[in-house]
């Protein structure tokens, strides 16, 4: 029973009551619905693919505030808060008028001590509208707003708003952020002791800040009292009694994780349309830590060799998810510009683009994996590529040429491509910031352009996906992504799906890459838990600025880079020596965890396995001494029966070559008949090939002209047109050259059937040109011939 009041005070109370009631009715009936779900700003939380927190950002107002729906807030938190703050929450209409009058009398009339009577709804009104409820008019407004809120929102919606607005100490607001910071877990995973602790903080967040030692002791004591009340209402929870006596670990905001920093920074900068909220990324924190650990240990071991920084990325080519991204070895090391993201920075790729030249050449029918290509000095206009070791190996298979990273064969194949070139492929694969095609020329084959590590691994993923290019995925499909219909959304993996290389060409290229041995092949084979291929390639950029290793293993594309963000070169920055060891360390670690599973074994490809003559790369004839299994694409790959190994007749008496077989005077022998240009390359490479002996003098020209291969004119090209200045006509000379069979010795040159000169095999003949159209013919000493047409015209 309230004590009797004097008439004046009674009048004030009645007037205030009726005025408030009138305003409440007007507010209830005519004011629009307030939006209590939207404070000034929310934080953004990024998680790994399994839900581990990677980073929690401050909101725009420098507070941690994370929107958490009511169904993600455990009942223990809801019930503990209502038990402590508002036991009649589900009965009142937003204001507990009896409690309010009692509080008013105690606080303002009796003045014994301050008593609060705010309901959960009233607290939502105060927190949302930011009103000062320590004065009468502020309290009146709070009451009116609470009634307004109750009209427009359900109890669950009001409770949800409270748990997202309530202060939990320092700059932490909302139970979602409080749970992540204080207990390193989402709110839904809070247990009863943690729930009780959190429910006490909003009433006095400054004095009950759990990270303050003095406040924590008071908080724990208050929690014991609340738990006693809890057991009166929920006696079935008495099994928590022992846990309530144990110390509770509480973390501070300074303990928040800062994982995959380059990845998260890029995600935020590249996709600014992402609204604040919670996002599950493609990152696997276990794999991220694996890359970080190996990179750090590797650089520490190799610092004496001049290695100070590295970047790496691991992409699951089946899902196209970036599961680990390491932009630098140390994000916080300013000496190496650690905050630069090496995965997204443009760098010269060195030789890592060569596999795509070979894939395009296979697709165009220029080669198959065992086709012989020429590793020899060759001039392409004003461009003369050289090999890293300054040596030339002569004729080698396309597979050897690729895994040994020979430059001339790669440039020559790129030069011969007619349909789709390497530049066209890079454009189709959405490689950014390319210069015009003419800017690079043939140097593009050797790393003349710049790509990012991410662009590079997507190209290799395209090979693993049998020529199908897809974009990367950096957010999980179930992430709370804004603008899901936006084609540029970061979890829209289907925005760029296209077949860039045929499945057959991609598969054959992978088989070629699998022949590349590991850096330490013997130990690598011993340490493997199981047998699996590694389809990989190294690269070294000009002036030793970048060392690369990139490849496919199991379901992953892995790339490692070693270098300096300053662009300064170092002799140690060689792909196989600097980047490959780290590449295989990571592979071994993945294997040790059983993560390398599966193999690229597609079905339904138009590929045939046949016997190939090991020496020539063609189908074997009956005289080929050794064969091996090889793959080719029927109707596309350049496959023919080899004619290099030929059986000839040797005169027993002289050892010279006979025209016809006689069982008494001749014997049979098999020799290799190589074109003269390849014979020359074998010699340059130090490879000795046994030459067939010359014919007997008694052999007539008509006996030899139909045997073996005719010469092939390499200069001039057929139907070529030469333009010569009139003033230089007398001084000009045009080179005539041809490749011949091994047994050719002399070449005779004719222009319009007029003999113009002779030279030894492999020696060019120089002709002084005339104006007009001409037929040029060459005949070797055995009577075999070839011809081309050419034209010479003058300009003044």
List each model region and its residues:
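Non-catalytic, structured segments within soluble enzyme domains
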Residues: 23-25, 112, 116-289, 293, ...
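Active-site-proximal helix/loop microenvironment
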Residues: 183, 216-217, 431-490, 494-500, ...
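N-terminal type II signal-anchor transmembrane helix
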Residues: 1-49, 108
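Active-site SXXK
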Residues: 79-82, 230, 291, 320, ...
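Soluble, non-transmembrane domains of envelope/secretory-pathway proteins that act on or interact
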Residues: 4-9, 13, 47, 244-256, ...
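Active-site beta-strand/loop architecture of penicillin-binding DD-peptidases
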Residues: 262, 310-347, 351, 359-360, ...
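Short, well-structured active-site flanking segments
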Residues: 90-100, 173-176, 236-238, 336, ...
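Conserved catalytic neighborhood of penicillin-recognizing serine enzymes
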Residues: 106-134, 258-269, 367-422, 469, ...
């Amino acid at each position: 029973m309230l004590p009797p009041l004097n008439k004046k005070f009674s009048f004030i109370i009645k007037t205030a009551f009726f005025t408030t009631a009138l305003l409440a009715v007007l507010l209830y009936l005519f004011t629009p619905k307030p939006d209590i779900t939207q404070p000034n700003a929310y934080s953004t939380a990024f998680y790994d693919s399994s839900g581990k927190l990677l980073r929690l950002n401050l909101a725009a107002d420098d507070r941690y505030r994370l929107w958490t729906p009511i169904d993600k807030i455990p009942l223990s938190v809801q019930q503990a808060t209502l038990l402590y703050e508002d036991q009649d929450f589900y009965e009142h209409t937003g204001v507990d008028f009896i409690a309010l009058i009692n509080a008013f009398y105690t606080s303002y009339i009796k003045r014994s001590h301050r008593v609060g009577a705010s309901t959960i709804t009233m607290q939502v009104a105060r927190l949302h509208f930011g009103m000062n409820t320590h004065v009468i008019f502020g309290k009146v407004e709070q009451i009116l707003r609470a009634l307004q809120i109750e009209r427009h929102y359900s109890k669950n919606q009001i409770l949800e708003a409270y748990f997202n607005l309530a202060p939990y100490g320092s700059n932490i607001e909302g139970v979602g952020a409080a749970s992540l910071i204080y207990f390193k877990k989402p709110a839904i995973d809070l247990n009863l002791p943690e729930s009780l602790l959190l429910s006490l903080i909003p009433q006095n967040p400054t004095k009950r800040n759990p990270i303050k030692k003095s406040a924590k002791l008071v908080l724990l004591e208050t929690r014991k009292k609340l738990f006693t009340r809890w057991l009166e209402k929920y006696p079935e929870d008495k099994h928590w009694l022992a846990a309530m006596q144990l110390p509770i670990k509480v973390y501070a905001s300074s303990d928040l994780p800062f994982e995959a920093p380059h990845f998260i920074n890029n995600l935020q900068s590249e996709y600014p349309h992402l609204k604040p909220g919670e996002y599950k990324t493609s990152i696997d924190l276990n794999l991220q830590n694996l890359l970080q650990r190996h990179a750090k240990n590797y650089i520490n071991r190799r610092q004496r060799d001049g290695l100070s920084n590295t970047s790496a990325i691991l992409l699951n080519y089946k899902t196209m998810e970036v599961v680990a991204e390491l932009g630098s070895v140390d994000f916080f090391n300013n000496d190496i510009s650690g905050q630069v993201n090496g995965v997204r920075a443009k760098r010269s790729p060195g030789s890592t683009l060569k596999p795509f030249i070979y894939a395009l050449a296979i697709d165009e029918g220029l080669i198959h994996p065992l086709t012989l290509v020429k590793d020899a000095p060759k001039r392409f206009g004003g461009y003369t590529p050289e090999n890293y070791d300054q040596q030339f190996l002569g004729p080698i298979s396309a597979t050897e040429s690729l895994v040994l990273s020979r430059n001339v064969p790669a440039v020559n194949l790129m030069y011969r491509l007619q349909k789709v070139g390497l530049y066209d492929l890079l454009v189709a694969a959405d490689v950014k910031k390319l210069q015009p095609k003419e800017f690079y020329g043939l140097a593009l084959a050797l790393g003349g352009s710049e790509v990012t590590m991410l662009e590079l691994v997507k190209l290799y993923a395209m090979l693993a996906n049998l020529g199908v290019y897809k974009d990367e995925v950096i957010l999980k499909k179930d992430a709370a992504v804004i603008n899901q219909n936006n084609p540029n959304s970061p979890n829209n993996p289907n925005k760029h799906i296209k077949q860039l290389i045929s499945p057959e060409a991609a598969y054959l290229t992978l088989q070629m890459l699998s022949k590349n041995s590991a850096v330490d092949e013997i130990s690598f084979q011993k340490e493997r838990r199981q047998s699996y291929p590694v389809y990989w390639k190294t690269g070294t950029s000009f002036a030793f600025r970048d060392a690369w290793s990139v490849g496919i293993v199991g379901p992953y594309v892995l790339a490692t880079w070693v270098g300096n963000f300053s662009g300064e070169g170092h002799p140690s920055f060689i792909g196989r020596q600097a980047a490959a060891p780290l590449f295989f360390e990571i592979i071994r670690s993945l294997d040790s965890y059983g993560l390398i599973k599966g193999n690229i074994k597609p079905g339904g490809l138009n590929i045939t396995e046949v016997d190939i003559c090991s020496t020539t790369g063609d189908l074997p004839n009956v005289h080929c001494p050794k064969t091996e299994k090889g793959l080719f694409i029927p109707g596309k790959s350049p496959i023919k029966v080899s004619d290099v190994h030929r059986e000839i007749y040797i005169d027993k008496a002289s050892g010279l070559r006979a025209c016809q077989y006689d069982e008494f005077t001749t014997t049979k022998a098999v020799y290799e008949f190589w074109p003269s240009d390849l014979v020359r390359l074998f010699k340059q490479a130090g490879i000795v090939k046994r030459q067939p002996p010359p014919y007997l003098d008694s052999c007539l020209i008509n006996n030899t002209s139909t045997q073996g291969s005719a010469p092939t004119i390499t200069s001039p090209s057929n139907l070529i047109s030469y333009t010569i200045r009139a003033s230089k006509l007398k001084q000009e000379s045009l080179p005539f050259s041809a490749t011949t069979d091994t047994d050719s010795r002399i070449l005779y040159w004719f222009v319009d059937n007029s003999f113009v000169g002779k030279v030894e095999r492999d020696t060019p003949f120089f002709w002084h040109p005339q104006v007009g159209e001409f037929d040029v013919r060459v005949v070797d000493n055995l009577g075999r011939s070839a011809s081309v047409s050419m034209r010479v015209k003058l300009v003044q």
